[in-house]
Amino acid sequence: MSKNADLEAIPAAEEIKKPNPPKEEASIKGFTWWRRTLQYNTGLGLSEDEKLNYENDYKYILERKQCKQCYEYKDWILKYSPTVTFMIQQIAKLSDGNPNIDGKNLKPFDESKIICDICPEWKSGGFHPDLGILICQNRIRNKWHLEDTLAHELVHQFDNLKWKVNWLNLKQHACSEIRASSLSGECRFGQEFARRGFGFKIANGHQECVKRRAILSVMGNPNCKDRAEAELVVNEVWDSCFNDTRPFEEIYR
């Protein structure tokens, strides 16, 4: 499984407990919710049970809002992103039941295999060959972050269909991570500058970003002993995998 890492060093996974639905829907709407918020913020007449119920309901509202926003972003990106729509077309050509290589009369891409959910890990998305693509709704910063994340995971899906990747094989995993970070757009100048500011190197900055993110992802592989092994494996496959831009003719973003 792919882990789309965003940080220099990956923090430990959070312990996330999903909130329970509110006892009454009316309690999180209108005047009642405003009153509860005011009471929580001031502490006036607030019992411990009321405090815990408010915190649960606040988290419930936040997660529901994140989920709605994530699916809205996803639907927009699937419709309007040139990178994502191109990847979907290429994946459709490789999918079972789609032997028509000229791209005509293809079965539609199964968008239900792209889901939004809460992720305890500090990653923005993931790919599983049997389950599909996960978008981490609590880690997505904006629509364009979701576009990069989805493009990254679609490269993994393409690789898995074309080459039957063994995700526990470190070299195969590393190769797909290199390609996904390079082709998705997540290492383009604007994104790296936003993340790293003036620490971003204009010369070879794209390559350094791709290598850094690939190493972090390979470190999450259960067969990887440590960072040193991840770096070794990424370096071993670097030249061939970085220069392989399929299904694009070149690095598009």
Swiss-Prot record:
The record gives the membrane topology as: Peripheral membrane protein
Per UniProt, what is one GO molecular function of this protein?
metal ion binding
**EC number(s) of the enzyme?**
3.4.24.-
GO annotation, biological process: mitochondrial protein processing; mitochondrial proton-transporting ATP synthase complex assembly
Where is this chain's protein located in or outside the cell?
Answer: Mitochondrion inner membrane
Keywords assigned? Hydrolase, Membrane, Metal-binding, Metalloprotease, Mitochondrion, Mitochondrion inner membrane, Protease
A GO CC term attached to the entry: mitochondrial inner membrane
- Disordered: annotated span: 1-23
The cross-references to PROSITE patterns, in alphabetical order and at most eight, read: ZINC_PROTEASE
Q: Where is the composition biased (Basic and acidic residues)?
A: 14-23
- The entry marks the following residues as binding a divalent metal cation, namely 152, 156
Domain of life assignment? Eukaryota
What this chain does, per the entry, is described as: Has a dual role in the assembly of mitochondrial ATPase. Acts as a protease that removes N-terminal residues of mitochondrial ATPase CF(0) subunit 6 at the intermembrane space side. Also involved in the correct assembly of the membrane-embedded ATPase CF(0) particle, probably mediating association of subunit 6 with the subunit 9 ring.
Q: What is this protein called?
A: Mitochondrial inner membrane protease ATP23
Q: Which organism is it from?
A: Vanderwaltozyma polyspora (strain ATCC 22028 / DSM 70294 / BCRC 21397 / CBS 2163 / NBRC 10782 / NRRL Y-8283 / UCD 57-17)
What is the gene name? ATP23
